[in-house]
């Protein structure tokens, strides 16, 4: 039986990562014991993937319109607007 080591996206730990149930869509969730963060490897909605927020902000800073950003990224217009609205808050 092959084992796959899962790395925590927050603290990069491989030891202490355990399975932590499933999401409502049936995707496996993981828990990092050292930092107590939870995450899943598969996303039901593409706007939840890591890095999407920063790509939307970068496109806006380079002059790409909201509708064009939504079309290119494959997310809804309201999602782009929400990311831009929340980008001014502390991250």
From Swiss-Prot:
Cited InterPro entries: InsA_HTH_dom (IPR024431), InsA_N_dom_Znf (IPR003220), IS1_transposase_InsA (IPR051252)
Keywords for the protein's UniProt record, in alphabetical order: DNA recombination, Transposable element, Transposition
Source species, domain of life: Bacteria
Pfam families: HTH_Tnp_IS1, Zn_ribbon_InsA
BP GO terms, sorted: DNA transposition
Residue pairs linked by disulfide bridges in the UniProt entry: none
Family per record: Belongs to the IS1 elements InsA family.
Protein's job: Absolutely required for transposition of IS1.
Protein name (database record): Insertion element IS1 7 protein InsA
Protein's gene: insA7
């Amino acid at each position: 039986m092959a084992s796959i080591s899962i790395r925590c996206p927050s603290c990069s730990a491989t030891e202490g990562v355990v399975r932590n149930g499933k999401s409502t869509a049936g995707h496996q969730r993981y828990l990092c014991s050292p930092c107590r963060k939870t995450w899943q490897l598969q996303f039901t909605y593409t706007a939840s993937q890591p890095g999407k927020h920063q790509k939307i902000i970068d496109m806006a800073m380079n002059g790409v319109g909201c509708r064009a950003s939504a079309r290119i990224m494959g997310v809804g217009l309201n999602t782009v607007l929400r990311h831009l609205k929340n980008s001014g808050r502390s991250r």
